[in-house]
Amino acid sequence: MENRWQVMIVWQVDRMRINTWKSLVKYHMYVSKKANRWRYRHHYDSNHPKISSEVHIPLGDAELVVTTYWGLHTGEREWHLGQGVSIEWRLKKYRTQVDPGLADQLIHIYYFDCFSESAIRKALLGHRVSPRCEYQAGHTQVGSLQYLALTALIAPKKTKPPVPSVQKLVEDRWNKPQKTRGHRGSHTMSGQ
């Protein structure tokens, strides 16, 4: 029987960012209790030698699993010291990988207080609404005019420490795409 390869998307992340992610997850699991249903698996609980940790986040019947890896091949830069993160959505036997933005939205739907679009209707009907969102990473679109007016009326309160964001975990701070600048007379660089 021949070897069968399975390809996974692993986001290269520096070690300090992974440590920050782990400490934020543990803080919200054990201290603030906002993520008390989450499960943290240490490297010694896994039988895979490259897995550093796993965070299992229940989402109704499904769960989101954020796995951190170590000992991978180094990346293009010296700070990519073989560390990585994969994000997987599981429902019974079905598994698929998701991107960090979608992972943040899924976490946002199930956890943490939110001042969302439904707050507009509740406020108009005279109901009491939660004045702020604790998980700003879950909002990717620009809100409606009424939503923006309500959020401008009530200033967001910064939570310390912040809620763990998967998108912030895999964000690449150092490798921003560089803008191409040519010489003054170069038509090939400016596209003219």
UniProtKB/Swiss-Prot annotation:
Site (Cleavage in virion (by viral protease)): L150, T151
Sequence segments annotated as region (Disordered): 161-192
Region feature (Interaction with host APOBEC3F): 14-17, 74-79
Induction per the UniProt record: Expressed late during infection in a Rev-dependent manner.
Region called RNA-binding, residue ranges: 75-114
Motif BC-box-like motif, residue range(s) on this chain: 144-153
GO MF annotation list: metal ion binding; RNA binding
Major place of residence: host cell
A biological-process GO annotation: viral life cycle
Comment, domains: The BC-like-box motif mediates the interaction with elongin BC complex.
Function: Counteracts the innate antiviral activity of host APOBEC3F and APOBEC3G by promoting their ubiquitination and degradation. Acts as a substrate recognition component of an E3 ubiquitin-protein ligase complex: mechanistically, Vif hijacks a host cullin-5-RING E3 ubiquitin-protein ligase complex (ECS complex) and the transcription coactivator CBFB/CBF-beta to form an active E3 ubiquitin-protein ligase complex that targets APOBEC3G and APOBEC3F for polyubiquitination, leading to their degradation by the proteasome.
Protein name: Virion infectivity factor
Gene: vif
